[in-house]
A protein has these predicted regions:
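Residue-level recognition of specific faces of alpha-helices
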Residues: 20-26, 59
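N-terminal leader/signal peptides at the extreme start of proteins
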Residues: 1-19
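Short, flexible active-site loop motifs that bind/organize anionic cofactors or intermediates
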Residues: 16, 43, 127
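Membrane-proximal N-terminal amphipathic helix
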Residues: 45-87
Length: 187
C-alpha cells in the first residue's frame, strides 16, 4: 500500500513539475520577443524614412512645376521668391507654414531666382531644402530629375552639373548629419 502511495505521489509530483514554464524559459521567451519587437521597430523606422524621402522628392517636383507654370510667359525668373510661390496657392497646404514652405523632414524650403553662365541673369531658379538628413540627402542627389535640372549640390560642396550624382559623389556632398540640398533648374 505504501508503494502505491509513493508511486501516486511521484506521478503527481511529475505532473506538477511539467506544468508551466521555469523562470529561465520565461526569460528566454521575453528575450526572443524583445529582439523581434526591436527588429520590427528598426524596419518601421527605415520604411518611414524612405517614405519621407519619396514625399520630399514629390514636393520638389510640385515646386518645379508650380514655378515653371507661373513663369511660363516670362523671359526670366526675376521677382521669384518663396513667398510668391506660397501666395500663388499652387502647392499643397501641407507644405505651407505661414509665409514659408516646409519639406517632409520639416526643414525650410527656399526658392530664389539665379543666374547661369549660359542663360544670363535670372535665367534659372534655385530650390533649397534645409535640414535634410544625411541618408535622405544622398538618395535625393542620386535621383535623375530630368532635363530641366541644371545643377545640384549639398551644403558641404559646390554644386555640380554632372547629374545625377554617383553614390560616391552624393556621399561626399552629404557628409554632414543634416544638409542643405540645392537644385538649380534652368529653362
Amino acid at each position: 500500500m505504501i508503494s502505491k502511495l509513493n508511486s501516486a505521489y511521484a506521478r503527481k509530483l511529475r505532473r506538477s513539475r511539467e506544468r508551466g514554464a521555469t523562470m529561465m524559459e520565461v526569460i528566454a521567451y521575453l528575450a526572443i520577443a524583445a529582439v523581434i519587437v526591436a527588429g520590427v521597430l528598426v524596419l518601421l523606422s527605415i520604411a518611414f524614412g524612405q517614405s519621407k524621402t519619396t514625399i520630399a522628392l514629390q514636393q520638389l517636383n510640385q515646386i518645379q512645376t508650380a514655378v515653371r507654370t507661373l513663369y511660363s510667359g516670362q523671359s526670366s525668373y526675376q521677382g521669384l521668391s518663396t513667398s510668391v510661390i506660397v501666395n500663388s496657392k499652387a502647392l499643397q497646404q501641407s507644405m505651407i507654414s505661414g509665409n514659408t514652405l516646409r519639406h517632409a523632414f520639416n526643414g525650410a524650403i527656399t526658392i530664389t531666382p539665379t543666374s547661369t553662365t549660359d542663360g544670363g541673369a535670372n535665367s534659372a531658379f534655385d530650390v533649397s531644402f534645409a535640414n535634410v538628413p544625411q541618408d535622405a540627402c544622398q538618395q535625393m542627389l542620386t535621383k535623375d530629375l530630368g532635363r530641366g535640372l541644371y545643377e545640384a549640390g549639398a551644403s558641404t560642396t559646390a554644386q555640380q552639373p554632372n547629374l545625377p550624382f554617383t553614390l560616391a559623389q552624393a556621399t561626399a556632398s552629404c557628409s554632414a548629419t543634416y544638409n542643405t540640398v540645392t537644385w538649380t533648374f534652368g529653362s
